[in-house]
Every structure is written in C-alpha cells, then in structure tokens.
Amino acid sequence: VQLLQLYLFVTNPKRYNIVEKKNYSYDEAYGESLKYFQGDELAARVWVNKYAVKDSFGNIYEKSPEDMHWRIANEVARIEAKYPNPLSSEELFGLLDHFKYIVPQGSPMTGIGNNYQVASLSNCFVIGVDGEADSYGAIFKIDEEQVQLMKRRGGVGHDLSHIRPKGSPVKNSALTSTGLVPFMERYSNSTREVAQDGRRGALMLSVSIKHPDSEAFIDAKMTEGKVTGANVSVKLTDDFMQAAIEGKPYTQQYPIDATEPAFQKDIDASALWKKIVHNAWKSAEPGVLFRSEEH
C-alpha cells in the first residue's frame, strides 16, 4: 500500500495527498477530534469510537476527521483517475472537509480506503434468494448471507413472506411446517451472535399482511425476550387498509402472489389493524410498510 501511494505521489503529486501512516493513542485522537469539533465532546468520542480507522488490535490510525476525509478523497481520486475529467483528491477533500457538502454514510466513512479491515461500503442490504425460497436450504442460505454481511458491518433486511404458514404439509418427518415465527428467532439469534465493534448487528424482518402467519408475526415480540435481535415491520396493502376501514373481511393466502394459492383464509381486517396499533403502542413494534410507497 505504501509503495502504491509513493508511486501515485511521484507520478502525479498534485492529485494525491499522502497522509502519514502512524498510530495514535485514544487520548491523542480524542484531543485532536475535540479541537476539530470545536469542543463537542459527544461528536469527538463518537468519531473516535466508530469511524476512526483501527486495526484488529485496536490501534488507531487517524487522529481526526481531517485524516478520514483525506483517506476517502485519496481513494475516490484513485478511481476517478480511470475516467475522463477526474476530480483530484484536493477537490474531493474540499467537498468532504468539515462535512460541508458531502456526508457519507457510516460504513463508507469507515470502509473507503481502509486497508486494516474488511468493511462494507454500504450501510444496509436487502437480501433474499432467486426462485423457490421455501426450503431449509434457502432459509439457511439467507441466514449465512446475513451473517457474512453483518460481520462486515452491514445492516440487513429481508422478507419472510416466502415461508409457508404454520400447519402446511412438508415432506419430512415433521409432516407439517412450524410457520415463520421460529425462523424469526433464528435470524434474530444470528444477529445477536455477530459482534460489530462491541455492538450487535442491525436486522429488520418483514412479512406481507397477506401471509396467513402475519398475525403470529405481529404478536411475536409481545413475549418478553423473544426476537430481541431484530426489528419487525408488516407490509400493508391498500386493499387491506380499505377492508379495515369498511369493516370487511380480508383474504390471506399462500403463496401470497399466487393466482391459485395452496391455502386461503378470511380474517377480520379491522381487528388485525387494531392489533397492529395496540402492539406498536405497547412494545413499539411492529412497524408498518406501505408497499405502494416503497423505493
């Protein structure tokens, strides 16, 4: 890395700013950051604890956000140089300096140009599998992908509407499906097991209101100690909300998008909506997602 930096500097010294690589004590980094943030102790501590580049032994290699912004600017300039009319590291630094014009997300601030850790360059990921997803193989594949992303600092979200409802026939010794709630617990436990610099990962689970197990999903976190490693949200549709307003029944089915579903049942939409509101008041979950507003 140092040889590459030297080569880039010698061949084009105006385009790259080489930050000296040395490590700092926590007090040194905190002191410099405190000056940078003009006495804001919280900002200084958060930056040193979460965003200053460190190796796996805890050695700190940046003393203030100025070093971080040069690291990001140099790395982006390296990529820019491959394209016409590239921006120099000085120009990029001017956009980043003191968080004036560009404020990267947390993971990019930590990961871009970081040669000490394998870190994600995105804060959040939505994952799933292509094709048939209702099998143990598919469920565990999602679990593995979730863990791999989380250990690289990524937050993860995935939908459980592909899992067959409780009581559905299965071709194994269990004879019937356990439904989606036990898998909520599995994904939650995986989240709790993955450390991210002393904190657990971030997981969001969702399910369609059209899924026959959506009420069990909505109730899952009402029991203390259950699904503590995940936030949960239910995906609502306009036809469900209209049924709830008019006091009409609403049809749930599995698969949720099938024209000829294997299973259907009618529910009281108004009662389920009231349960969503009550549970959110009681435990702050579930959240609600309106599919027509997703982007």
Per-range role (PLM):
Residues 3-294:
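Extended catalytic cores of very large enzyme megasubunits
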